[in-house]
Structures are given as C-alpha cells and as structure tokens.
C-alpha cells in the first residue's frame, strides 16, 4: 500500500486551453528528500493514503506554499511507516499556469525557503537555492 500515488501535470490557461507539460517532472521514485529539488509533483497530482491524509493537515501559517510543506510531511510519515510511493505514469491533473503561487511569486519563494530550511537544514537549503537560480530558464 503506497503512502502516495502521484503523476504528471499539464499546464492550462484561464480558458483551460492546453499550454504544455509542467517544466518539473516527477521522479520515478519519489521521497520526501526529492522535494529538495523543488515542487516536483503538484499537490493536484499527489494522492496521499487516507490514514496519512486524515492525520496531516495543511499548516495554515503558509499562505502560498502550504502544499509544499504538506507533501514533504506526508512523505516523511509514509517513510516512517515503511510505505512506498507509486508513480502512476500518466497525466493526473491540469494546472492553471497563472495561479495564486505565480501571482505571489516572491512571497511563495520566501515561504518555500523557510519550509526547506525546516525540513532539510540551512546548508542544504542554501545550496539547492543556488542551483534553482542557475537552472532557471
């Protein structure tokens, strides 16, 4: 029984017209450590096992990146229970290209930095953010 079933996400515009696949793709094997590399799986394409879902609420102190923190915490709990993950190998969701996080990009990045610091520590977080800066198109 997997802790999480996850898949791919396509981007759409406000009229629900297809734009293309998301720039970040989910890895074949997803773990809480995978999120060091960014939000690799949209929460819309991330289905937590019901036992984990029921006991893991969004942390509402995060206005724009609560999903990022939630996914990491779900995966950590699944890891502690020796539950794996399952890549569905298909497109599970469409995602609005200009959503709330995009409209509040700087605030979202600051929240995400704080979340990563909490879960991965300072050295790793700073190193990965330097990589995010380099990889950005």
Residue ranges: model-predicted function:
Residues 4-5, 86-88, 124-128:
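A short coil-to-beta-strand element that immediately follows conserved catalytic motifs
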Residues 7, 20-111, 115:
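Conserved nucleotide-sugar donor-binding catalytic segment
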Residues 13-17, 96-97, 134-137:
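Short, solvent-exposed polar/charged micro-motifs at secondary-structure junctions
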Residues 1-20:
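Conserved donor NDP-sugar-binding/catalytic core segment of glycosyltransferases
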Residues 110-113, 117-137:
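Membrane-proximal basic amphipathic "stem/tether" segments
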């Amino acid at each position: 029984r997997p802790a999480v079933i996850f898949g791919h996400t396509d981007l759409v515009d406000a009229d629900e017209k297809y734009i293309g696949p998301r720039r970040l793709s989910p890895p074949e094997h997803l773990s809480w450590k995978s999120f060091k590399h960014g939000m690799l799986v949209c929460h819309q394409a991330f289905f937590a096992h019901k036992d984990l879902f029921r006991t893991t609420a969004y942390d509402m102190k995060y206005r724009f990146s609560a999903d990022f923190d939630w996914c990491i915490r779900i995966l950590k709990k699944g890891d502690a229970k020796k539950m794996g993950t399952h890549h569905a190998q298909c497109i599970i969701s469409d995602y609005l290209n200009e959503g709330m996080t995009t409209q509040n990009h700087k605030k979202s990045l600051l929240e995400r930095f704080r979340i990563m610091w909490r879960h991965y520590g300072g050295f790793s977080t700073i190193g990965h953010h330097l990589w995010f800066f380099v990889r950005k198109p």
